[in-house]
Regions:
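Conserved C-terminal "switch" segment of AAA+ ATPases
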Residues: 10-18, 31, 168, 182-254, ...
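P-loop (Walker A) phosphate-binding loop of NTP-binding proteins
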Residues: 57, 91, 159
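Walker A/P-loop
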Residues: 46-83
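Conserved alpha-helical scaffold flanking the Walker A/P-loop in AAA+ ATPase domains
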Residues: 41-44, 97-117, 146
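Walker B catalytic acidic pair
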Residues: 56, 119-120, 131
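Canonical AAA+ ATPase core
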Residues: 98-103, 120, 124, 128, ...
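Pre-Walker A (pre-P-loop) alpha-helix and adjacent loop at the N terminus of AAA/AAA+ ATPase modules
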Residues: 13-60, 242
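C-terminal engagement/docking regions of AAA+ P-loop ATPases
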Residues: 1-15, 247-331
Length: 331
């Protein structure tokens, strides 16, 4: 009974702390036509302190989405265009000698912002990618002999173009695993496309004004961490991730030859975190199986390695995740 009272009290607090979510979503909807899944994913990443890898062809409002979100929160935004000649110092910053003061001064790089768009992350060499990924993991950057904390909240949205893969530096599996979500975005619907044409021809880009603050986001994060996950839901999350490693244990023998490696414990942690954030967005103080299923594809698609057999059969990690969540017993 005490637990029920706690949940009730938590629901009231969630109702209070999540009021800004409606304002954020409506603010995004005024600027971004369609792409609801992209907006939801950005909110999940923001509320659960996770980073997002976005895959989609150019022109699908990836840059506009994160820029609009930063304006709605009145936060700093920066964009890094990854190119083959980029250096780690171009991302994190460097020491510059000042002749006037006769000493070295720190010049901070574009990574020092609340929202960082790493555009076409697979266009830059591995040492540049790892400089950004280290900053993402540690939430701090070392320039010279000094260590600097990155702003809070700190959200990186990296993009990849799935078509032009020539001359790129694909992210290693260990690096990809650091992204909480990998979101694949698709073209808008026919009606959405017509609306985009109308708005752009009219030249009416709505003005974006802040609807919340970075402090409100940090308060909301602490409430998200309190969202209740029952033991049965924990078991459900663990079963889904274990099914990516040992499919034959879950009557999925046909997947055994398709998967070269499954999700790490980081997959389980991120699945739980994302499900909590999703429950918060839905104004609930507890996680239900539907929350887990809603975020499973985005959390797991980049954490499953495919065998040559799977690739030859045109089986995608997307299909594997779908088979797993349809087979694993729901509590």
């Amino acid at each position: 009974m005490a637990e029920a009272i706690d949940i009730r009290e938590l629901n009231i607090r969630i109702e209070q702390q999540s009021a800004f979510v409606t304002n954020l979503v409506s603010g995004m909807d005024r600027v971004i036509v369609g792409q609801k899944h992209l907006v939801d994913s950005l909110l999940i990443g923001l509320l659960s302190d996770g980073h997002i890898l976005l895959e989609g062809v150019p022109g699908l409002a990836k840059t506009l989405a994160i820029k609009t979100l930063s304006q709605l929160i009145d936060a700093d935004y920066s964009r890094i265009q990854f190119t083959p000649d980029l250096l780690p110092a171009d991302v994190i910053g460097t020491m510059i000698y000042s002749q006037k003061d006769e000493k070295f001064q720190v010049k901070k790089g574009p990574v020092f912002a609340n929202f960082v768009l790493a555009d076409e992350i697979n266009r830059a060499p591995a040492k540049v990618q790892s400089a950004l990924l280290e900053a993402m993991q540690e939430k701090q950057v070392t320039i010279g002999s000094e260590t600097f904390q990155l702003p809070n909240p700190f959200l990186v949205m990296a993009t990849q173009n799935p078509i032009e893969q020539e001359g790129t530096y694909p992210l290693p599996e260990a690096q990809v695993d650091r992204f909480m979500l990998k979101v694949v975005i698709d073209y808008p619907s026919l009606d959405e496309e017509k609306k985009i044409i109308r708005e752009n021809i009219a030249g009416e880009m709505p003005e974006v004004t802040p609807v919340t603050t970075a402090e409100a986001i940090l308060r909301a994060r602490s409430v998200v961490r309190e969202v209740y996950i029952d033991e049965k839901i924990e078991q459900y999350i663990a079963d889904i991730v274990f099914a990516t490693r040992y499919p034959d244990r879950y009557a999925l023998k046909d997947l055994k030859d398709m998967i070269s490696f499954g999700g790490s414990p980081r997959a389980s942690i991120n699945l739980a975190k994302a499900a909590r954030a999703y429950a918060f967005i839905k104004r609930r103080g507890y996680v239900v199986p539907e929350d887990v299923r809603a975020v499973a594809h985005d959390v797991l698609r980049h954490r499953i390695g495919l065998t040559y057999e799977a690739e030859a059969s045109n089986i995608t990690s997307e299909e594997i995740v779908s088979k797993i969540i349809n087979k694993v017993e729901v509590p």
